């Protein structure tokens, strides 16, 4: 995707999002996917600041891309340094049960300024951290399923500089469980893990 024109501040916009993924099914029920997504960003060292290179995924993609923890592009996605998300997904389906594990490595697509005291005009490490997402889904019937998961995020100094705080917890986690009900013969939109 390519975005061009003017942003909300009437500044020139030139941004992109590109993704590549390969998948492999070595045995019945097992699916492996390896991929990377690159969303352009605006460098924090760009003092001219004439062109906005920050890609804006106009609508929410909560949990679908860039990890289930939603550290990036949910509520704080405007005028960012961009994102490189390298990921590996492993999904295994057995009868009515799906197990999934996703691993992500996040890196800023543009320069991050080191905001620590005495670090004037220095660049921070562009490493933003990693994330592991574990999920399990049981398809009870065509209209009812249950899904649960656990995610762990491992932050870095680069993420601390990007967020502008040294008090950022190095690790964050969350867990969830949900029941999905799709009553009747209506074709409901698919949510949760793909069976």
Question: How would you label these PLM feature ranges?
Answer:
Residues 68-73, 104-107, 112-133, 147, ...:
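Outer membrane beta-barrel transmembrane domains
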Residues 1-94, 98, 107, 111-118, ...:
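Extracellular/periplasmic loop regions
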Residues 164-168:
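Short proline/glycine-enriched turn/loop segments at secondary-structure junctions
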Residues 16-20, 84-88, 130-134, 173-179:
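Hydrophobic, lipid-facing positions within transmembrane beta-strands of outer-membrane proteins
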Residues 32-34, 90, 101-103, 136, ...:
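Membrane-embedded beta-strand positions of outer-membrane beta-barrel proteins
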Residues 133-162:
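C-terminal structured domain segments
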Residues 170-195:
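Outer-membrane beta-barrel "beta-signal"
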Residues 29-32, 96-101, 142-148, 185-190:
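Repeated loop/turn-to-beta-strand initiation elements of outer-membrane beta-barrel proteins
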